[in-house]
A protein has these predicted regions:
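Acidic, carboxylate-rich catalytic segments that either coordinate divalent cations
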Residues: 38, 50-56, 73, 82-177
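Transmembrane alpha-helix interface/packing and boundary motifs in multi-pass membrane proteins
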Residues: 10-15, 105
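Internal, well-ordered alpha-helical scaffold/interface segments
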Residues: 26-29, 74, 78, 98
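Single conserved hydrophobic/aromatic residue that forms the stacking wall/gate
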Residues: 1-8, 12
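C-terminal domain-closing interface element
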Residues: 63-84
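Short alpha-helical patches at coil-to-helix transitions and adjacent helical residues
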Residues: 5, 21, 139-142
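Long, well-ordered mid-to-C-terminal structural blocks that present hydrophobic/aromatic surfaces
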Residues: 13-68
Length: 177
């Protein structure tokens, strides 16, 4: 239904989901442009410290739930290592994975210094020719929609009834939330 579709996808329009891989890729491109290519690990470490000391974050690092590298990040990195050769952007992503977690641990503010899926996904899209950032959220949403559709098919196949949450009024929400 339209309501279900909207409820399922509207969460991706905000920056934390909707723009996350774009922001990560913009950061990687900023690094590449700053150093005219791939920096050394020492240069990258200083660049990250300068960014943190100016009050900004390192995009793609930290996850609300995970306390280890995001398994999706690990899968994307494995794919990139197997299929991408001599690419500055992917090399920077690899170097960031080695540099950023220790920097964030030393800084002491991050509960989770590990990369999330967005730290790698944008670099793969960019490498394979999708350079218009406006489509990144579309692909993210489609991947989520495919998962929801698959779950709906499985639910129908095994006879699980349609879920109809109890309806509440706006007044109830105001009083109880």
């Amino acid at each position: 239904t339209p309501l279900y579709s909207s409820a399922a996808s509207d969460v991706y329009k905000r920056q934390l989901h909707g723009l996350a891989n774009q922001e990560c890729l913009k950061f990687v491109l900023e690094v590449r442009n700053h150093f005219n290519g791939t920096p050394t690990q020492d240069e990258l470490k200083q660049f990250c410290w300068d960014r943190l000391n100016s009050g900004r974050v390192i995009p793609g690092y930290g996850h609300a739930v995970l306390r280890c590298p995001d398994p999706r990040f690990t899968a994307f990195m494995g794919f990139g290592k197997d299929h991408i050769e001599d690419d500055d952007i992917f090399s920077i992503v690899e170097s960031l994975f080695e540099v950023v977690p220790p920097v964030l641990q030393e800084q002491g503010k991050a509960k989770n210094p590990w990369p999330n899926v967005d730290a790698a996904s944008g670099s793969l899209l960019y490498y394979y020719g999708l350079t218009d950032f406006n489509y990144y959220t579309v692909l993210f949403s489609i991947s989520r929609a495919m998962g929801m559709i698959a779950q709906m098919v499985i639910n129908r196949a095994i006879g699980i009834p349609i879920t109809r949450p109890k309806s509440v009024t706006t007044e109830w929400i105001k009083n109880n939330v």
